[in-house]
Amino acid sequence: MAREQFQTLTEPMYYILLALMEECCGVDIMEKVKVISHGRVVVGPGTLYAMLAKFEENGVIRLTASEGRRKSYIITEVGKEMLKQEYERLKTMVLDGSGRV
């Protein structure tokens, strides 16, 4: 179901899932996205928490801890498979364009 819900991932989605390869909370996710993307992708709180809710609802990530307002998440096996498929899709696109651009 998750794969059908998210046919392709937007850049913020992709980087959020990469950040969640390790357990972390929202503030840490925003910082990791910025670091992993070398500052190209900046995810604001509104976008982040909307995506986290959709990802959790679809079993892409899971809640690991909740302390007051601070919640931590990690990617699930479903999410890892989805991330891998998106990586392969992007890699294929780059290869298709190689030598043509």
PLM regions: where:
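Intrinsically disordered, low-complexity serine/threonine- and proline-rich regulatory segments
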Residues: 1-7, 69, 93
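N-terminal helix-turn-helix DNA-binding core of bacterial DNA-binding proteins
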Residues: 3-47
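Helical "lid/switch" subdomain of P-loop NTPase nucleotide-binding domains
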Residues: 47-48, 79
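Beta-hairpin "wing" of winged helix-turn-helix
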Residues: 56-68, 74
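Basic amphipathic alpha-helical segments that dock to polyanions
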Residues: 48-55
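Basic, amphipathic "hinge/linker" alpha-helix immediately C-terminal to the N-terminal HTH DNA-binding motif
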Residues: 68-86
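Amphipathic alpha-helical dimerization/coiled-coil segments
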Residues: 84-101
